[in-house]
């Protein structure tokens, strides 16, 4: 079974959810994009590379747009006022077992879990204090 499937990127209680769907898979880079116009789309990319004889490296990127419109010649056009970029690299030794990798995923989920220090600092647009 493929894991290159659509998923909910932003869970906002149902109505404001942002779903991203597979859009491209070239040169080993999987890309998911939301259904918004390209200029306003959320985008996720993920690639897996052999970074050394002993390690496999995952590179994950997420683009979050600030959705806005711009009037050009009397026509409102969709634009992104700005974008926020997340870049994450994860290196896993090639001899890690599946259960080791499941534990790594649990650590990633805990890192970004609602209410924990890092997402709280980001959501409040502040630092760690």
Swiss-Prot record:
One of its GO terms (cellular component) is T=3 icosahedral viral capsid. GO terms for molecular function: RNA binding; structural molecule activity. InterPro entries: Levivir_coat, Phage_RNA-type_capsid. Pfam families: Levi_coat. Changing residue 85 to S: Binds, but does not photocross-link to RNA. Residues 31-104 are annotated as: Viral RNA-binding. One of its GO terms (biological process) is regulation of translation. Belongs to the Leviviricetes capsid protein family. The keyword RNA-binding applies. This is Capsid protein. Homodimer. The capsid proteins form dimers that assemble by group of 5. Twelve such pentamers are linked together with free dimers. The homodimers binds to the viral RNA via an operator hairpin, but also to many other RNA sequences in the viral genome; this interaction probably shifts the virus from the replicative to the assembly phase and ensures specific encapsidation of the viral genome. The keyword Repressor applies. It is found in: Virion. Keywords: Capsid protein, Repressor, RNA-binding, T=3 icosahedral capsid protein, Translation regulation, Virion. Capsid protein self-assembles to form an icosahedral capsid with a T=3 symmetry, about 26 nm in diameter, and consisting of 89 capsid proteins dimers (178 capsid proteins). Involved in viral genome encapsidation through the interaction between a capsid protein dimer and the multiple packaging signals present in the RNA genome. The capsid also contains 1 copy of the A2 maturation protein.
């Amino acid at each position: 079974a493929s894991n290159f499937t659509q998923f909910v990127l932003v869970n906002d209680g149902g109505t404001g959810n942002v779903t991203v769907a597979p859009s491209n898979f070239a040169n080993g880079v999987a890309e998911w994009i939301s259904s918004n116009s390209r200029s306003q789309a959320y985008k996720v990319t993920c690639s897996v590379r052999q970074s050394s004889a002993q390690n496999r490296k995952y590179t994950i990127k997420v683009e979050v747009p600030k959705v806005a419109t711009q009037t050009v010649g009397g026509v409102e056009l969709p634009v992104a006022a700005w974008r926020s970029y997340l870049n994450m690299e994860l290196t896993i030794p090639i001899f890690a077992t599946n259960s080791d990798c499941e534990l790594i995923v649990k650590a990633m989920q805990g890192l970004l879990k609602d209410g924990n220090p890092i997402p709280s600092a980001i959501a409040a647009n502040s630092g760690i204090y």
